[in-house]
């Protein structure tokens, strides 16, 4: 007898499944925090995956206190520069950017991404921001940062990736004072996160172009009788006669991949600059060798190698850190096949 249970194939939660507008993922919210002001996010470039041998520190686990093998993702994280301070106010429709103050210490490569002012009056811009903060019109302070991929050999581009990053804290004045101290400076990932820290990871997934409904949605193949008529990898029906239109819920061919996805509560197992501990013989496939600061994230992250990966303080975690993990060994076995 046939089963009476047949859930739909594929999730409608991410519809419409269309290409991301940019390869830079965007965080639409930042966690509220009463901690000291500092950057709430960072960015790096995906290198590849390997595995580590570590001591299981999950309480009440069956393997607690013993060595276990854990898959990890390597992300190269060169220093980022703080280019500007942005103040937000509120209007009828919500938050709106009301003022910015750009530094005059900008890298030459930034002109490849956007048009920069030749002689910005930094002091005048900061005075305007300070007036908005003192008057209470500015209710939030964020920083505009950018990466420098030209310092990496594994990422074949020179154009920086510009993004907006939140600042922790509840006092707007304290956040503004912190922003003034880091404006125009280079920030390392060690200034933002620690070993064992829980973070949210966002990236643009690997693109697969146009795919059919079987691969895109996971529907079943048609039976042999239909395949002889040329209908093997198609949906059984597009819908009823009435209403006389095709519903958006019907699985159809279209774009697959290159969507923004966010992984919540990923753990940073290690942050280091000792590249000999992770570089395999022959380098990583489609990337090469790690030559600077890097981190090891437990598990996988979205996107292919060389893809920009953004990190953020967790928004849905009950704990912000589990403690520093004890790593016994990092596999450097060649990945060349």
From Swiss-Prot:
Gene3D superfamilies reported for this sequence: 3.30.1430.10, Ribosomal protein L3, domain 3, Translation factors
SUPFAM superfamilies tied to this protein: Translation proteins (SSF50447)
Region entry Disordered, spans: 1-32
Question: Quick check: keyword Cytoplasm in the entry?
Answer: no
Supply the alphabetized keyword list: Ribonucleoprotein, Ribosomal protein, RNA-binding, rRNA-binding
User: What Gene Ontology terms describe what this protein does at the molecular function level?
Assistant: rRNA binding; structural constituent of ribosome
Q: Which GO terms describe its biological process?
A: translation
Q: Which Pfam family, any one, appears in the UniProt record?
A: Ribosomal_L3
Quote a single Gene Ontology cellular component term: cytosolic large ribosomal subunit
Report the coiled-coil segments. none
Q: How does it assemble?
A: Part of the 50S ribosomal subunit. Forms a cluster with proteins L14 and L24e.
Q: What does this protein do?
A: One of the primary rRNA binding proteins, it binds directly near the 3'-end of the 23S rRNA, where it nucleates assembly of the 50S subunit.
The entry's family comment says: Belongs to the universal ribosomal protein uL3 family.
Name listed for the protein in its UniProt record: Large ribosomal subunit protein uL3
> Species name for this entry?
Methanococcoides burtonii (strain DSM 6242 / NBRC 107633 / OCM 468 / ACE-M)
């Amino acid at each position: 007898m046939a089963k009476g249970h047949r859930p739909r194939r594929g999730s409608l939660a991410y519809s419409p499944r269309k290409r991301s507008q940019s390869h830079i993922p965007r965080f639409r919210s930042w966690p509220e925090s009463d901690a000291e002001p500092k950057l709430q996010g960072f960015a790096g470039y995906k290198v590849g995956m390997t595995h580590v041998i570590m001591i299981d520190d999950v309480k009440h686990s069956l393997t607690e206190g013993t060595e276990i093998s854990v898959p990890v993702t390597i992300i190269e994280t060169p220093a980022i520069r703080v280019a500007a301070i942005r103040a937000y106010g509120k209007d009828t429709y919500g938050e709106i950017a009301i003022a910015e103050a750009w530094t005059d210490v900008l890298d030459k490569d930034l002109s490849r991404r956007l048009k920069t002012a030749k002689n910005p009056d930094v002091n005048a811009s900061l005075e305007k921001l300070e007036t908005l903060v003192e008057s209470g019109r500015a209710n939030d302070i964020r920083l505009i940062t950018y990466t420098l991929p030209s310092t990496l050999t594994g990422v074949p581009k020179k154009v920086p990736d510009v993004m907006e990053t939140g600042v922790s804290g509840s006092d707007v004045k304290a956040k503004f004072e912190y922003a003034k101290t880091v404006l125009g400076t280079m920030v390392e990932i060690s200034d933002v996160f620690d070993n064992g820290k829980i973070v949210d990871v966002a990236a643009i997934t690997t693109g697969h172009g146009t795919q059919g409904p079987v691969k895109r949605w996971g529907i079943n193949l048609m039976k042999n009788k239909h395949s002889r008529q040329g209908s093997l990898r198609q949906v059984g029906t597009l819908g009823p006669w009435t209403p006389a239109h095709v519903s958006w819920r019907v699985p159809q061919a279209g774009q697959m991949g290159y969507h923004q996805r966010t992984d919540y509560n990923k753990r940073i197992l290690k942050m280091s600059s000792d590249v000999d501990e992770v570089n395999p013989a022959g380098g990583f496939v489609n990337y090469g060798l790690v030559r600077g600061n890097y981190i090891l994230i437990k598990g996988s992250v979205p996107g292919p190698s060389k893809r920009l990966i953004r990190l953020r303080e967790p928004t849905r975690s009950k704990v912000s850190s589990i403690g520093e993990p004890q790593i016994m060994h990092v596999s450097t076995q060649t990945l060349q096949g």
